[in-house]
Amino acid sequence: MSNGIVIIGSGFAARQLVKNIRKQDACIPLTLIAADSMDEYNKPDLSHVISQRQRADDLTRQTAGEFAEQFNLHLFPHTWIMDIDAEAHVVKSQNNQWQYDKLVLATGASAFVPPVPGRELMLTLNSQQEYRACETQLRDARRVLIVGGGLIGSELAMDFCRAGKAVTLIDNAASILASLMPPEVSSRLQHRLTEMGVHLLLKSQLQGLEKTDSGILATLDRQRSIEVDAVIAATGLRPETALARRAGLTINRGVCVDSYLQTSNADIYALGDCTEINGQVLPFLQPIQLSAMVLAKNLLGNNTPLKLPAMLVKIKTPELPLHLAGETQRQDLRWQINTERQGMVARGVDDADQLRAFVVSEDRMKEAFGLLKTLPV
């Protein structure tokens, strides 16, 4: 009898894979094992929970039991996999073990917390579980410090501000979204955040946190300090690679996979935020959706390489939303920026005047799909 496919993880990547497998094969045994409850929720909603006044349980879209029944699955929630015996094709928890024919690691990524004194006082919002643990503190907080001015930090800063909280956003860089685009392109959103009342501390560094009788004292560089009620780390994600490393798989920034989503072991695959696909870490929904479609075919013997088109990344800042695509972080691009009252179109071109990247905002986001077609793949 076939041992089937074992998937470690229950997030967006794992669920997309299950749905794609079941479209092609209703009977192959599928086992999912994860450390959380395995209830389904939409992770991007975490950027808007405070202004929407949502509790953690409000985010649940489908319970684990409903998921198992709908897709004919064996589920093992609240279960930590401790070890993979790749030679024996076995995964092990503290009290159990499972045989597999093919194994998929969909272990996601964890929030990076800066290693400063008092780091244990920082909260993270990388999962429903993490939000559940701190939702009362965040709801009650009047003054919030967000560490990191990237995509998630900018989304959270706007959301907390819209909820009426006093928000400070700190980042080492000279502009927000610095790893995604140059300052002349992000300045429109930066100006909007400032207009809304977000206090931006750019080119600034958090040096430590300390609990006080009236809140949390954040010590900054240049002999500055501020007192707040909550501190959120939004300083990026780190792919979860510990289990893959223990299994002897090749690891770089993430679990290394090829165009077939195959790791350095022929019967182990990886998908989602934990992966590095041919040298690229792509923690966005669209590449995960496309990867899940391809991996489902490969697990069922229809070998198909992953080919990723130019893809949109959406920054969900409702007062000034942005869509971007292409190599927006390239230093050698020349930016042509057209700003009107209804929005901005910024085109990044190379020395040959070839469009390599673009950023569009507000009502001009409808121009994104036309621009997307002109980007080289």
From Swiss-Prot:
Its cofactor is FAD. The keyword Thylakoid does not apply. Coiled coil: none annotated. It is an enzyme of class 1 (oxidoreductase). It comes from the Bacteria. Gene3D superfamilies: 3.30.390.120, FAD/NAD(P)-binding domain. Keywords: Cytoplasm, FAD, Flavoprotein, NAD, Oxidoreductase. It is found in: Cytoplasm. One of its GO terms (cellular component) is cytoplasm. It catalyses: 2 reduced [nitric oxide reductase rubredoxin domain] + NAD(+) + H(+) = 2 oxidized [nitric oxide reductase rubredoxin domain] + NADH. Its EC number is 1.18.1.-. One of at least two accessory proteins for anaerobic nitric oxide (NO) reductase. Reduces the rubredoxin moiety of NO reductase. Belongs to the FAD-dependent oxidoreductase family. This is Nitric oxide reductase FlRd-NAD(+) reductase. It comes from Escherichia coli O17:K52:H18 (strain UMN026 / ExPEC).
